A protein has these predicted regions:
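Short alpha-helix boundary/capping elements
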Residues: 5, 60-64, 136
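Catalytic DNA-binding helix-loop module of base-excision-repair DNA glycosylases/AP lyases
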Residues: 35-85
Length: 140
């Protein structure tokens, strides 16, 4: 039921509106993330699918905007990466954020972007997610 509901939400969107949400997440206040991560109406386990929402947006951008800057518009929201972010925040002496604050996708994105900005080597949001996830998977 939850998957069907998410499909209905996506199918309700006009193609140009969907592409606009994907192309300009900040300018649309991450509206597509909000739409996809609203709690489902599943009778047994209604869920708020923030991880799915971010992955959908991330991979849709990779598909629709391949080779363009917009292909990296959405970092994947993941509990492993979320749990590792405070280590990077401390290392780079960035503004501290609580784990609860990092549950907000916009705050999560801002944190990822700050860390990437302070990294010694250029790295994409996608690259950062993969490196952190691979390193910390099984270590937390």
């Amino acid at each position: 039921m939850g998957r069907e509901e998410l499909c209905r939400r996506l199918l309700k969107l006009d193609r140009d509106v969907l592409l606009g949400y994907l192309k300009d997440p900040e300018g649309t206040n991450y509206r597509l993330i909000d739409i996809l991560s609203e709690q489902t109406n599943a009778p047994f386990r209604p869920r708020r699918n923030l991880s799915f929402a971010s992955k959908f947006c991330h991979y849709a951008c990779l598909a629709f905007f391949k080779g363009k800057e917009a292909q990296d518009n959405y970092p994947v929201y993941d509990n492993i990466v979320k749990g590792a972010l405070p280590k990077y925040i401390a290392y780079f002496s960035l503004n501290r954020r609580s784990q609860a604050a990092l549950s907000d996708y916009q705050t999560y994105c801002e944190c990822v972007d700050e860390i990437i900005t302070h990294a010694d080597e250029p790295i994409s949001r996608n690259g950062f997610d993969h490196l952190v996830w691979c390193y910390f998977k099984g270590r937390q």
